[in-house]
Amino acid sequence: DLESHLQRCHQLSVTVLTDHQDLSNTELKTILNSTAPQQYRIRAKLRTYKPQKLYQSIKLHCSKCNSLQEVPGGDDFNFILQGSAITAPNPELHNTSWYDSVMWTTQDQKQRKIAIHFVKHDEMLQQPEDTLLMIEGGTLKEVWKLTKRFKCVIPVSSTEDDLELLDLSAPFLLQGNIKYYGCKRCSTPKPIKSLSSIAAEQRPSWEPTEIAQVLGIELLQYVFVMKFTLVDGTGALNAYLFDY
């Protein structure tokens, strides 16, 4: 567990943080006065590290605009789903040449209308573990139930002409327990019918990168980001860790 490992490092008086056994130790003061890039071996103490909680190290990164953002919480997604459920599914958009639709009304007081659209391949439904479906009017709990059974789930809402993705603050795609997000700045969402091009492939794999591409979404990648402050008595150096 990285967090307990970092705490142990923090407690040790001196920790060798880099390898390079062939190099002699260089003081941080010398490194701070040098021009990059150079390769050094240091002997230093870990003064602080950020963030303090390991889960806060996970961010979303856009390789196109190089932005870093926080991973939205489940409450944000739930709020967007609730907002989209206000608009009832448009029956005119059901049962097209490339998806079959099922609609029902919930038995609770709200009597929500839910529609699920199962994408077909060669005019046939695929096995659940290979199926992409779209859901309108579902709650967070219902969406997660579907991800346990089906390969891909895309939350959508209906307009007069087509199904469309929700606000990009919500994941545009869920696969297993992974939520995939798009960059709001760099994405230009296309109509959902763009997915029919993948359904027409010989063996649709429903890969997130391909789905993002046909839907005009710039896919955000999960990255691991940390900052360490190292000291050795001659100076303090900030070291950043950034990794996919």
Model segments located where?
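Acidic/polar residues in short coil/turn loops that connect beta-strands
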Residues: D232-T234
